[in-house]
Amino acid sequence: MTSRFMLIFAAISGFIFVALGAFGAHVLSKTMGAVEMGWIQTGLEYQAFHTLAILGLAVAMQRRISIWFYWSSVFLALGTVLFSGSLYCLALSHLRLWAFVTPVGGVSFLAGWALMLVGAIRLKRKGVSHE
């Protein structure tokens, strides 16, 4: 995933987040139960946080190419699609099959954050000042 693609993914994910949040608040909340709306809300929260993380990685990749940040963004994007997407599908369809996809997305999130940590640790320090 290039930083251009990461920015495009973040823009699309952010758009979907806002659109689904508004649709959920104004339409779905009138037709869905509390459990389903909870699934939607959880999906939206995780999508928002991870979209911002992907955006941050894209900006970091503009300054310095890092294989660790590259793979971090891949796993965070995959986690967003699988975790949040499966919660949306579960809420809208009630097919329990989606409940098995959600943890795969969660593991993808964890891998993405771990890779980001490794990438951050491996960054070279620029002129450390001891003033």
Curated annotation (Swiss-Prot):
The keyword Transmembrane helix applies. Pfam families: DUF423. It is found in: Cell inner membrane. It comes from the Bacteria. It is a multi-pass membrane protein. It comes from Escherichia coli (strain K12). Residues 1-4, 86-97 are periplasmic. Disruption phenotype: Mutants show a slight decrease in the internalization level of some proline-rich antimicrobial peptides of eukaryotic origin. Belongs to the UPF0382 family. This is UPF0382 inner membrane protein YgdD. Residues 26-64, 119-131 are cytoplasmic. PANTHER family: TRANSMEMBRANE PROTEIN 256. May be a peptide transporter or a protein that facilitates peptide internalization. Coiled coil: none annotated. The gene is ygdD. GO terms for cellular component: plasma membrane. The chain crosses the membrane at residues 5-25, 65-85, 98-118. Keywords: Cell inner membrane, Cell membrane, Membrane, Transmembrane, Transmembrane helix. InterPro entries: DUF423.
